Amino acid sequence: MKVLVAYMSKTGNTRKVAEAIFEEITDEKEIRSIDEVDSIENYDISFLGFPIHMEGPDKKAARLLEKHCINGRKVVLFITHAAPEDSEELPPMLDKFRVAARGANIVDMFDCQGQLDKSTRRIMSVLPSAKLRRWAKEDNSTGQPDKTRLDRARAFSRSVMDGLQDDRVEVCAESQEERDEHRILSRV
């Protein structure tokens, strides 16, 4: 099986998660910045990682997802964000990545907290959105992703790859309840 791990990372958070995922893959594999990827057509499965920007994928990330996630290609999404994983506001933001990747067979999705960049926090603190201003003020993301979160990414990668080897991978859960249950189980 040929596997691609590709990521977009401005601050290094998503790159760290990509590297943790990559470490656990024993099949033929490549890791690259998403900007270096022309196509995912020649891979059996692609792990694609992005940070959340302004409550979802930024325009570049959305375009890349729409470009690569076509024809039912098997894709695993991994997303980093400054919010804690149990944040009530997070699921709709993650859904925006699923929508952008809707042409793919989304095998699974992983998300974890990453450290909010200081310049981004300053920008968020003056935006019109009260929610974003509050997040900037209440930021608790220093040092993320930590060892525990990176270990979770490694375990997630092993689980996905084991499922593929066993031909038991299913399309990512669609209902909010199923996604919440999956997120809780993936932390255990």
Language-model features: locations:
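A generic structural signal for ordered secondary structure
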Residues: 4, 15, 32, 156-159
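FMN-binding flavodoxin-like domain, especially the glycine-rich phosphate-binding loop
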Residues: 23-30, 45-188
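Short non-domain terminal segments
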Residues: 5, 41, 45-48
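Short acidic low-complexity segments
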Residues: 30-42
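N-terminal beta1-alpha1 ligand-phosphate binding loop
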Residues: 2-26
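Short, surface-exposed connector motifs at secondary-structure boundaries
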Residues: 1-2, 75
